[in-house]
Amino acid sequence: MAWYQGNDLRKPTGGKKTRHRKKRKHELGRPPTMTRFSVKEAQKIIRVRGGNLKIRLKRAVYVNVAVPNEGKVTKTRILEVVETPSNPQYARGNYITKGTIVRTELGLVKITSRPGQDGVLNGILLEK
């Protein structure tokens, strides 16, 4: 079955609404990427609307860390997933989303990019 991002045809009271047109192709979606911390990087290139390409990060090893007081960015290895505010179960499964806090060689880093959309992990170093 397809992932549909359109209206669910229910009124706020729970009653059914009638459909005034068919479903459109632009209302289709895709399942979430669910980027994981791993020992080997993996990306997936998919074709999106308009013939463009989107890179999805399936497995991540490194993160680009911005150090605020030094004003530079360094690529560093991820050691573990510490916390995921959006879903506590994600930290146990080593899933990485935007807002996830990971431990790196430099310290704790908060992920600022969307790995399923951008294809890269960017983050900012948290102060101690």
Curated annotation (Swiss-Prot):
Keywords: Ribonucleoprotein, Ribosomal protein. Residues 13-27 have a biased composition (Basic residues). It holds the Pfam family Ribosomal_S8e. Residues 1-31 are annotated as: Disordered. Gene3D superfamilies: 3.10.290.70. One of its GO terms (biological process) is translation. GO terms for cellular component: ribonucleoprotein complex; ribosome. Part of the 30S ribosomal subunit. Belongs to the eukaryotic ribosomal protein eS8 family. This is Small ribosomal subunit protein eS8. The lineage of its organism: Archaea, Thermoproteota, Thermoprotei, Desulfurococcales, Desulfurococcaceae.
